[in-house]
Amino acid sequence: MTYAIIEASGKQLWIEEGRYYDLNHIPVEPGQSIILGKVLLLNKDGHVSLGHPCIEGAVIKATVMRHLRGKKITVFKMKPKKKMRLKKGHRQELTRLMIDSIMT
């Protein structure tokens, strides 16, 4: 089983080939390919490579499937005894990526 741990959108993700992942919005049109270069760990058929902090020459090829919005969260702020109440909603803009290949 081949997998990698990468850093993208301020998060560290465990990724595998052929699966899709939702990241923060990336300004790329759907259908286009992108390359993710910050590979922190790579496991290829039991052989583990660990970067300091990144593995040189290891890249992840991915295709942008679509842009979507995440689940709605509600933010509620209140100050006691002051009748101050603030209720807001937020939906994060996301980009869904399909991992095509993990290359060294």
UniProtKB/Swiss-Prot annotation:
Keywords, sorted A to Z: Chloroplast, Plastid, Ribonucleoprotein, Ribosomal protein, RNA-binding, rRNA-binding
Stored InterPro entries: bL21-like (IPR028909), bL21-like_sf (IPR036164), Ribosomal_bL21 (IPR001787), Ribosomal_bL21_CS (IPR018258)
A Pfam family annotated for this UniProt entry: Ribosomal_L21p
PROSITE patterns given in the database record: RIBOSOMAL_L21 (PS01169)
One of the protein's GO biological processes: translation
Location within or outside the cell: Plastid, Chloroplast
GO cellular component: chloroplast; mitochondrial large ribosomal subunit
GO molecular function, one term: structural constituent of ribosome
Function: This protein binds to 23S rRNA.
Family the entry assigns: Belongs to the bacterial ribosomal protein bL21 family.
Assembly information from the UniProt record: Part of the 50S ribosomal subunit.
PANTHER family, A to Z: 50S RIBOSOMAL PROTEIN L21, LARGE RIBOSOMAL SUBUNIT PROTEIN BL21C
Protein name listed in UniProt: Large ribosomal subunit protein bL21c
Organism whose genome encodes this protein: Porphyra purpurea
Source taxonomy: Eukaryota, Rhodophyta, Bangiophyceae, Bangiales, Bangiaceae
Gene label: rpl21
